[in-house]
Amino acid sequence: MLYELKALIGSPVVATDGEMGSVRTFLFDDQSWKVRYLVVDVGNWLKRRDVVLPITTLEKPDWANKTCSAHLTKDQVGNSPDVDTEKPVSRQQEIAMHDYFGPLASWVDSEFGMPAMPTGMKYPVQAAEVLHLRSTSHMLGYHVRATDGEFGILEGFVMDEDSWHLGYLDVKSGDWLRNRSVLVPTRWVQSVSWADFVVQLHHSMA
């Protein structure tokens, strides 16, 4: 089924041995539009404020009760690799998460992690290499432009709970007197300018 992703922001995130924090944001691949990670605000029980969990460690969200559950203990979460969520996630950081969470994953996603490597071998990596991972929260407020001009403001994402794919953008279109929400397929996105905060569509909205 399809759900508004923003309904989960601020919702409890529960480990197998108790609540660990709340949903801060989600990280998605800006090429496949698939959610890859959940960013959890863990409050004060860890020295760091946020932890990043692969979706492969999560159950389907409980939309009725607005809760996310992980197949991890709080100790496993606390010992996970430290990722600065205010900066783009590097390939090196994702390899560290893959190495740590891989054996803990409750299911396998074809787009998560790296190809299998023989024991003892390391993945070739350049420290500066950055993945195409973006925060859903950081994109809210971006201008959405069609081929025939300005269309609206990005207000959210609609996700398929089975695939974690962001199939639609929730766009507020029109002026303050006649604004309306329009669902725009992500397959219509031509490009995203992170510097200019613009989502460009290759489609007319007239």
Map each language-model feature to its residues.
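Peripheral interaction segments used for macromolecular assembly
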Residues: 1-206
